[in-house]
Amino acid sequence: MNITVISVGKLKEKYLKQGIAEYDKRLSRYCKLNFIEVADEKAPENLSEAEEIMIKDKEGEAILKSIKDGMFVIALDLAGKMLSSEALSEKIDKLALQGNSHITFVIGGSLGLSQGVLKRADFKLCFSPMTFPHQLMKLILLEQVYRAFRISKNEPYHK
């Protein structure tokens, strides 16, 4: 199984880099993990709705260029479906059984994802109605993917 995480912006915080590196190492027994970071656009305070859409569209274009044919795309979106850890594990298992060997998770920037990216998504996933910094979301996502693989293999961790 190949898993790609496409995110907006460069990861700068050392503690997040360390956490992501730890889950990258843990996940290596279950999947091949790839990271793609696309440039984030400057978003000044008090944007108009049109300016917000323009920024999301520009980031979205870069995201869409990174998505290859054959990838099953899961967009992280507040309007997406919430799943338990067990349900995420089942979803990943089911995708593998259906022949989807490449899952791509997409994390938007501070303004979220463009409509183009949301339309391209095969599934929209919401982790919580709360908003998280998009860089922290990458670490939370990897922890949940790791937990999903452990659940799937009936290995201790998720209790």
UniProtKB/Swiss-Prot annotation:
Intracellular or extracellular location(s): Cytoplasm
GO terms under cellular component: cytoplasm
Chain ranges passing through the membrane: none
EC number: 2.1.1.177
Record's catalysed reaction(s): pseudouridine(1915) in 23S rRNA + S-adenosyl-L-methionine = N(3)-methylpseudouridine(1915) in 23S rRNA + S-adenosyl-L-homocysteine + H(+)
Cited Gene3D superfamilies: 3.40.1280.10
Keyword flag Amino-acid biosynthesis: no
Statement: the UniProt record of this protein carries the keyword Transcription regulation: no
GO molecular function: rRNA (pseudouridine-N3-)-methyltransferase activity
Annotated S-adenosyl-L-methionine binding sites: 76, 108, 127-132
Domain of life, source organism: Bacteria
Keywords tagged on the record: Cytoplasm, Methyltransferase, rRNA processing, S-adenosyl-L-methionine, Transferase
Function: Specifically methylates the pseudouridine at position 1915 (m3Psi1915) in 23S rRNA.
Record text on subunit structure and interactions: Homodimer.
Annotated family: Belongs to the RNA methyltransferase RlmH family.
HAMAP family listed in its UniProt record: 23SrRNA_methyltr_H
This protein's name: Ribosomal RNA large subunit methyltransferase H
Lineage: Bacteria, Bacillati, Bacillota, Clostridia, Peptostreptococcales
Gene for this chain: rlmH
